[in-house]
């Protein structure tokens, strides 16, 4: 049976993550408050950030930046802004 959560990002009930994907207290919060759909959206944004800003997940400063951006995106409603990126037209 799938686990459902009230997703803070989507502001509705949605399928929850299968397990805690991120360590610590923030990871617990993500597991309890973020849906699979919202997590997929974050992963897409994170990939863009890593590629466009040439970040390394091995660099502690880059990991800190990614964590800050993740928190702003998932819990504070801030979209990721990447200089020079224009989203495709629908």
Curated annotation (Swiss-Prot):
Protein's name in the database: Probable Fe(2+)-trafficking protein
Any one GO BP annotation for this protein: cellular response to oxidative stress
HAMAP family: Fe_traffic_YggX (MF_00686)
SUPFAM superfamilies in the record: YggX-like
Superkingdom to which the source organism belongs: Bacteria
Gene Ontology MF, one: iron ion binding
Self-association and partners: Monomer.
Keywords on record: Iron
Protein family per UniProt: Belongs to the Fe(2+)-trafficking protein family.
Role summary: Could be a mediator in iron transactions between iron acquisition and iron-requiring processes, such as synthesis and/or repair of Fe-S clusters in biosynthetic enzymes.
Pfam families: Iron_traffic
InterPro entries xrefs: Fe_traffick_prot_YggX, Fe_traffick_prot_YggX_sf
Species per Swiss-Prot/TrEMBL record: Photorhabdus laumondii subsp. laumondii (strain DSM 15139 / CIP 105565 / TT01) (Photorhabdus luminescens subsp. laumondii)
Coiled coil stretches, renumbered: none
